[in-house]
Each structure stands twice: as structure tokens, then as C-alpha cells.
């Protein structure tokens, strides 16, 4: 069956900010001295961890910006040890593999996003007919231009008929009753993937540390920066959206579907630079009279930018919940091959 090509073992949890769970995704981090460390990331938007091939967790020390192997703190929170990955064998020093964020901390992160939204967090887009999705490309002040043409990024949204894409997936699983058209902004000339360029560098949207003094310091500051970024991008392209495009098919006063593709790769630990769905509750942005609320947030230059992740996040736009329960340990148990 063609649909099964798109199912990925991605797990998730019920909340107002919907997340995407990944296991053992290869990552490369650079220490302040320039040393490169090949590692993996496991987790989701609420909490994730970097770890080596033997599952020993690594964490940044915000004082010097270096990554160290993690150890349990007094209250079982993860804190950096004095052992730098690549310089010691963690087994020799009795370190414990598989250390993860505590369930209490994970739930605190989840509750923050849930409690910060209003009653509109339960609104859903239409599940039949046609949906016009607005997608905005964004790069930061210190980013290069997107390396691939617009047609390359468009494929995951709406490939040719019969090929895996967001549009094809929902057309098939809805028994030919839901058709999703995606309109990309800013407009493209000669297939160049133009993007809204923000005034701040990438580090502004990452946690503060000894090597990133201008980063955000807490969840409230992170929220303000993310929402301001997206509001500015939307205001910059809003005049390009044709009034003939029906972006509010169910006439509830809200844009049915909005997504953002941010240049670069996802961040580490609980950074905002991670695929997620949220709502623009702290800003008031309208396009042709409809307010922007729900949105999808994607990163462009990595394995994460694929049909499976996009389809997973879009299910939340339609009102579907996440399908796993984090227990403070290893990988959660999703619903197997039926999850996307």
C-alpha cells in the first residue's frame, strides 16, 4: 500500500504545543576550541538529549560553552561533569548511560506551553475540501542564501501526482476528500528560493551561554523572540498573498494553515530551533482579514525536512493529538507502524 511508505517511527505527546520525537539522529557539534564531535540526538520539543554511540548523554556547561558528559545532580537534574567527550571513556569513570530529562522537568516544559495559550489552542483546520497553506521561508542575518532551488523545497509539500508529499498523503488518507495547496513566500524568480531575512543572527534564537552571550535566557524570552520573528516575517509577505486565495475555508476568522521553513539544522536540547507546531498567541497578525494562529515550524537543511515530519505536524493542524507518553527514561512506546 503506497501510504505505508510515508510512515516513520516518530512519536509524540498530547499537549497544546505538539512535538516530534526522534531517536538517534546523527548530529555534529563544535566545541569552543573548534573540536568536532559526532553524536546523536534523541527526544522532542519539550526535552531531548545529545548522546554518543554508547548512549552516554552530553550536556553543555553554560559557563564555558563546552559539552561534557552528563551526571545526575542533587535533585536528579542533569548537570555537566568534568569529562569532555572524546577525551575519556565514560565507562572507566563509572558514568551512567541513558541519562535523560526527568519526567518532572519534561512536564514543566510541556505545561509552560499548554498554560501560555488561550482557548483557541483547540481550533482545527477543515478536514475536507481544499486548504490553502501559507509557507514562509526565513533565514537569519548571518545565514547564507538557501542552497537549493524553490522546486527542491516544494517537493515535500506538493510533489507530482503519486509521489510522496504532504498533499498526496492527505489526499490518500482522507479518501480523496482533502486537498492541500501550499503557497510559498516570498515569491520566487527563476526558481531561486528567496527568503525573509531577519535582522538578528542565529545565536539570538539559541540559549544564552558563555559562547553565545546574546541568546535567550528563559522560556518567556524564547517565546517573545520566536513570535516576533514569525510576526515580522508574516507582515513582510502579507501583501503578496492574493485576496483570491481562500486562506480561511471554514470562515472562522483564522488562517487555516501556516508554516515556516527556517534555514539550517535543528538545535540541541530544548532550543526553539526544532520542528514543532504552536500558535502565535502573543502577536496579532492578519492576512486578508484572517488572523494567523496555528503554525508549523520546520528546519530546512537536514534529515528532519522530509515528508514524514511535515505530515506528522500537519495532523496537529487538523486537530489530531500526539501518540506517546514520556516516562522520563528511554524512547516512548508509540503506536507502531500506524504513527506518522
Regions found by a protein language model. Give the residues of each.
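Sec-dependent signal peptide recognition
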Residues: 2-13
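A generic structural micro-environment signature
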Residues: 7, 35, 43, 144-146
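N-terminal prosegments of processed precursors
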Residues: 19-123
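Active-site-proximal segment of zinc-dependent metalloprotease catalytic domains
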Residues: 97-99, 103-334, 338-340
Amino acid at each position: 500500500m503506497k501510504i505505508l511508505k510515508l510512515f516513520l517511527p516518530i512519536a509524540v505527546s498530547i499537549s497544546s504545543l505538539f512535538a516530534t520525537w526522534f531517536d538517534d539522529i546523527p548530529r555534529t557539534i563544535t566545541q569552543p576550541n573548534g573540536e568536532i564531535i559526532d553524536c546523536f540526538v534523541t527526544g522532542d520539543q519539550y526535552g531531548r538529549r545529545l548522546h554518543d554511540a554508547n548512549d552516554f548523554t552530553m550536556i553543555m556547561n553554560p559557563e564555558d560553552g563546552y559539552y561534557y558528559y552528563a551526571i545526575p545532580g542533587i535533585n536528579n537534574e542533569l548537570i555537566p561533569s568534568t569529562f569532555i567527550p572524546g577525551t575519556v571513556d565514560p565507562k572507566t569513570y563509572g558514568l551512567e548511560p541513558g541519562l535523560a530529562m526527568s519526567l518532572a522537568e519534561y512536564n514543566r516544559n510541556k505545561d509552560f506551553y499548554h498554560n501560555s495559550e488561550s482557548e483557541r489552542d483547540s481550533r482545527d483546520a477543515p478536514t475536507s475540501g481544499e486548504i490553502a497553506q501559507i509557507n514562509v521561508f526565513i533565514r537569519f542575518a548571518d545565514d547564507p542564501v538557501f542552497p537549493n532551488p524553490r522546486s527542491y523545497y516544494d517537493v515535500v509539500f506538493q510533489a507530482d501526482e503519486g509521489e510522496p508529499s504532504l498533499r498526496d498523503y492527505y489526499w490518500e488518507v482522507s479518501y480523496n476528500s482533502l486537498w492541500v495547496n501550499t503557497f510559498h513566500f516570498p515569491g520566487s524568480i527563476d526558481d531561486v528560493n528567496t527568503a525573509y531575512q531577519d535582522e538578528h543572527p542565529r545565536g539570538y534564537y539559541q540559549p544564552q551561554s558563555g559562547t553565545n552571550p546574546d541568546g535567550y535566557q528563559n522560556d518567556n524570552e524564547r517565546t517573545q523572540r520566536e513570535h516576533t520573528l514569525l510576526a515580522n516575517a508574516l507582515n513582510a509577505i502579507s501583501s503578496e498573498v492574493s485576496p483570491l486565495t481562500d486562506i480561511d475555508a471554514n470562515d472562522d476568522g483564522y488562517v487555516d494553515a501556516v508554516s515556516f521553513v527556517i534555514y539550517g539544522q535543528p538545535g540541541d536540547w530544548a532550543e526553539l530551533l526544532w520542528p514543532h507546531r504552536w500558535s502565535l498567541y502573543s502577536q496579532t497578525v492578519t492576512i486578508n482579514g484572517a488572523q494567523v494562529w496555528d503554525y508549523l515550524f520546520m528546519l530546512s537543511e537536514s534529515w528532519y525536512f522530509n515528508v514524514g515530519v511535515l505530515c506528522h505536524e500537519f495532523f496537529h493542524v487538523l486537530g489530531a493529538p500526539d501518540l506517546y507518553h514520556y516516562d522520563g527514561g528511554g524512547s516512548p512506546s508509540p503506536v507502531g507502524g500506524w504513527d506518522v
